[in-house]
Regions:
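A short beta-loop-alpha structural element at the N-terminal edge
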Residues: 3-19
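Hydrophobic alpha-helical core bundles mediating ligand binding, dimerization, or RNAP-core interactions
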Residues: 17-25, 37-42
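Helix-loop element at the rim of GNAT/NAT acetyltransferase active sites that forms part
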Residues: 19-32, 74
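A short helix-loop-beta-strand connector motif used in the catalytic cores of GNAT acetyltransferases and
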Residues: 43-54, 82
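Conserved beta-strand in the GNAT
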Residues: 54, 61-70, 87
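Conserved acetyl-CoA binding element of GNAT-fold acetyltransferases
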Residues: 78-90
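Conserved acetyl-CoA-binding loop-helix of GNAT-fold acetyltransferases
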Residues: 88, 94-107
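Conserved active-site alpha-helix within GNAT-family acetyltransferase domains
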Residues: 99, 114-116, 120-141
Length: 143
């Protein structure tokens, strides 16, 4: 059985995270982040505005990631989180990594609730990962 490590990502693994993040953006048809985007991301990570989590295989390769952005919520009157940036390399899918990564992120971040907004095609996947409480519609304000 392969040995996997689940951890909070920091500056030491930022380059690996950037590579995985580029693959994620390409997979969903979005533009790759610019260097300025990545600089802002690193700053946000260092200030813990966003927490990135990863799964590393026994060879040290980052094979999956997700993020939790903590915020205060009156839904629970405690710290809640917004779940994003979820990506597992295709060769590592269907091995239970996704479930374990989500569980690790929830436990380590200490959030009292975790929400996710997703495309219609991803709803069943997120339900299978434990996102089962419907909260109505999620809309973004156009700026």
């Amino acid at each position: 059985m392969e040995q996997l490590q689940f951890l909070r990502l920091d500056r030491a693994r930022f380059d690996a995270l950037c590579g995985l993040h580029r693959a994620y953006k390409e997979a969903i048809g979005e533009d790759a982040p610019t260097q300025a985007d990545l600089d802002r991301l690193l700053g946000a990570m260092e200030r813990e505005k966003i927490l990135f989590y990863g799964c590393v295989d026994e060879g040290g390769q980052l094979v999956g990631c997700c993020s939790v952005s903590p915020t205060f919520s009156t839904y629970t009157y405690a710290t809640a989180g917004v779940f994003e940036d979820f990506y597992i390399l295709p060769a590592f899918r269907h091995r239970g990594i996704a479930r374990r990564l989500v569980s690790f992120a929830v436990e380590d971040s200490g959030v009292s609730s975790l929400t996710v907004g997703c495309a219609d095609c991803d709803v069943e996947m997120y339900k299978a990962l434990g996102f089962t409480v419907p909260l109505g519609n999620l809309l973004a304000f156009e700026l």
